[in-house]
Amino acid sequence: MKMKLVTAAIMGLAMSTAMAATDATSLTTDKDKLSYSIGADLGKNFKNQGIDINPDVLAKGMQDGMSGAQLILTEEQMKDVLSKFQKDLMAKRSAEFNKKAEENKAKGDAFLSANKSKPGIVVLPSGLQYKIIDAGTGAKPGKSDTVTVEYTGTLIDGTVFDSTEKAGKPATFQVSQVIPGWTEALQLMPAGSTWEVFVPADLAYGPRSVGGPIGPNETLIFKIHLISVKKAA
């Protein structure tokens, strides 16, 4: 979070605080409605992020800044306060992220350890696991080939994060342009096959977060139907 964004967010929360005493029925102009909407949205975000701010003092700062009154803190003092706030917030977010990554890794390892002994599960040296649902008889793709597939991706708790069914059409891509777990599995699948593939975190997105339901070090499960293979020229 850059300093300007931090300052803008605090100002927005102050707007929300200042408007809190105003009856909602008095929001008669577009300016009032916009001001309140921005303030309320930022206020909710601050609350969700656990940022502890005194709304009354914040509103006082906004009022002084807008009126041109003598500020209680100097510009240098405010710069130092905001800089510390930014550093503390980043440290907190980093600690939360690392904790989540460790938890996801432990859960994923435990899941894969239990899953590997289930009937029909094949475990590869890389740690990738798969189960053949329907065995196809077509060609197997190479790394440079293009495939068309239908798939559903879930977390180990069953949360669906992606699906071609939702998109309404199959996906087409080069085998080498997907996560390592997919690249490895696809090269073993004959066209026409349907597999359930269990992808360890290090063969998926690893310790980074890609947004949405997929957090750091998530083990992912895919049901993949390989429709066709187009050989590279």
From Swiss-Prot:
PANTHER family linked to this entry: 39 KDA FK506-BINDING NUCLEAR PROTEIN, FKBP-TYPE PEPTIDYL-PROLYL CIS-TRANS ISOMERASE FKPA
GO biological process: protein folding
GO cellular component: cell outer membrane
Subcellular localization(s) per the UniProt record: Cell outer membrane
Keyword terms: Cell outer membrane, Isomerase, Membrane, Rotamase, Signal, Virulence
Pfam families: FKBP_C, FKBP_N
Similarity comment: Belongs to the FKBP-type PPIase family.
Keyword flag Cell membrane: no
Signal peptide coordinates: 1-20
Gene field: mip
Keyword Cytoplasm (UniProt): no
SUPFAM superfamilies, per the entry: FKBP-like
Name of the featured protein: Outer membrane protein MIP
Chief localisation class: membrane
Enzyme Commission no: 5.2.1.8
Entry superkingdom: Bacteria
